[in-house]
C-alpha cells in the first residue's frame, strides 16, 4: 500500500504564495499596524523610506511570503473578487478609483482591518498621500465615492487554519 500526499494552493495567476504560509488576515493586519505613521512616498515600498499604496500592500503581504504585483491595478484578482462588502474579512484588499472620481480605473488599494457585517461598512489601512500609513473608514466621503471592489488573497483571511489543504489518497 502506498500513500500519496498532495498539497493544493490557490492558483491565482499573479499572486505567488509561499510553499507553506500559514498567514491569516489577523497576521496581515497586525503587521500592517506596525507601520502606522510611515510617510507616503510615491514608488517606494520600504518601511525605512516610506510607501505608496501598492508598495505598502505588497510589502505587508511579502512579510507573509506572499508576492503581489507592484501596482494597485495588478493586485486586483478578479477570480477572488468580493462584490458584497458585508463578506469582507480582515486582510482582504479593497480597491478605489484614483484621485479622479470620474475614472473607472483602480488607482488605490488598502487592507481591510475591520468590517460591520450588518452594514458592510469597513475600515482599512493604507498609505495615504496626505497622511502616510493610516486607518480610514469606508464611510469617509472621499473613499466612499471612489470604492470599486475588493478581493481575497488569503483563503483563510480571518481563520487560523492554514490555506493549504492536505489530501490523502490510498493506492493499493
Walk through the language-model features, giving the residues of each.
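Bacterial Sec-dependent N-terminal signal peptides
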Residues: 1-15, 19
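Aromatic- and glycine-rich peptidoglycan recognition patches
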Residues: 16-20, 82, 106-172
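N-terminal hydrophobic or amphipathic helices/low-complexity stretches enriched
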Residues: 13-32
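Catalytic cysteine-centered active-site loop
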Residues: 16-19, 38-90, 100-101
Amino acid at each position: 500500500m502506498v500513500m500519496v500526499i498532495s498539497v493544493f494552493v490557490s492558483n491565482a495567476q499573479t499572486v505567488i504564495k509561499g510553499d507553506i504560509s500559514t498567514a491569516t488576515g489577523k497576521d496581515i493586519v497586525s503587521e500592517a499596524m506596525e507601520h502606522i505613521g510611515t510617510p507616503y512616498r510615491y514608488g517606494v515600498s520600504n518601511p525605512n523610506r516610506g510607501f505608496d499604496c501598492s508598495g505598502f500592500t505588497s510589502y505587508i503581504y511579502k512579510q507573509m511570503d506572499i508576492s503581489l504585483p507592484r501596482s494597485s491595478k495588478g493586485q486586483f484578482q478578479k477570480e477572488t473578487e468580493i462584490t458584497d462588502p458585508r463578506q469582507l474579512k480582515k486582510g482582504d484588499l479593497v480597491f478605489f478609483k484614483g484621485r479622479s472620481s470620474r475614472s473607472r480605473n483602480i488607482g488605490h488599494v488598502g487592507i481591510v482591518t475591520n468590517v460591520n457585517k450588518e452594514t458592510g461598512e469597513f475600515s482599512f489601512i493604507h498609505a495615504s498621500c496626505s497622511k502616510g500609513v493610516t486607518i480610514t473608514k469606508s464611510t469617509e466621503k472621499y473613499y466612499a465615492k471612489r470604492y470599486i471592489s475588493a478581493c481575497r488573497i488569503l483563503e483563510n483571511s480571518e481563520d487560523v487554519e492554514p490555506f493549504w489543504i492536505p489530501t490523502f489518497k490510498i493506492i493499493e
